[in-house]
């Protein structure tokens, strides 16, 4: 009888353990789905801000899109690193080309490949753009640009660019 009782106790504890594990996994799934939905909404907010800031070319607005330690590989020359240098680079570009105007900025989010892991997200896709260097210049539409963007979730739940590279 003692041996049977030990087996029943072990079976009961194993069943209880499995049940609690399954229950906690099932209970965590909605939390993970909620977090994923919140991340997607916050990333979409960054996308909209990116489009607005790029079209206006406001240096302060463009700077707000970046994490404090962001790296921009899109400027001519060496990479621009850090929020302070990012702001200076945008202001310098605006001063050098005061009539520069973005006529079209259209990242293709429908075909963009993306993944979110913890506080990081990566996006790889294409962007179409048209711009004018001055008011009298003809519009320039470079070929579709392939870019890679690394996003970093901020402590407030928002997302900012951590690294942007163009190919």
Segments and roles (model prediction):
Residues 1-10:
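Bacterial N-terminal signal peptides that target proteins for export
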Residues 9-19:
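Bacterial N-terminal signal peptides
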Residues 22-68, 161:
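Short, low-complexity N-terminal intrinsically disordered segments enriched in polar/charged residues
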Residues 37-44, 59-119, 126, 136-142:
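A solvent-exposed, acidic/Ser-Thr-rich amphipathic alpha-helical stretch
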Residues 112-122, 151-158:
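A short, structured loop/turn motif at beta-sheet edges
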Residues 122-128, 148:
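Beta-strand secondary-structure signal
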Residues 130-134:
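Sequence/structural signature of outer-membrane beta-barrel proteins
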Residues 142-167:
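Short beta-strand edge/turn micro-motifs at domain boundaries
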């Amino acid at each position: 009888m003692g041996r049977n009782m030990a087996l029943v106790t072990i079976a009961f504890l194993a069943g209880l353990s499995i049940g609690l594990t399954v229950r906690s996994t099932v209970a965590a799934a909605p939390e993970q789905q909620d977090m994923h939905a919140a991340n997607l909404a916050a990333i979409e907010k960054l996308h909209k801000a990116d489009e607005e800031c790029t079209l206006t070319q406001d240096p302060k607005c463009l700077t707000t899109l970046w994490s404090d330690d962001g790296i921009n590989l899109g400027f001519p020359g060496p990479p621009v690193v850090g929020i302070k240098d990012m702001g200076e680079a945008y202001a310098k570009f605006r001063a050098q080309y005061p009539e520069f105007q973005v006529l079209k900025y259209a990242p293709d989010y429908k075909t963009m490949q993306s993944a979110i892991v913890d506080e990081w997200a990566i996006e790889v896709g294409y962007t179409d753009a048209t711009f004018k260097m001055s008011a009298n210049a003809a519009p320039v539409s470079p070929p579709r640009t392939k870019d890679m963007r690394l996003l970093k979730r901020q402590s407030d739940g928002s997302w900012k660019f951590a690294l942007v590279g163009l190919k």
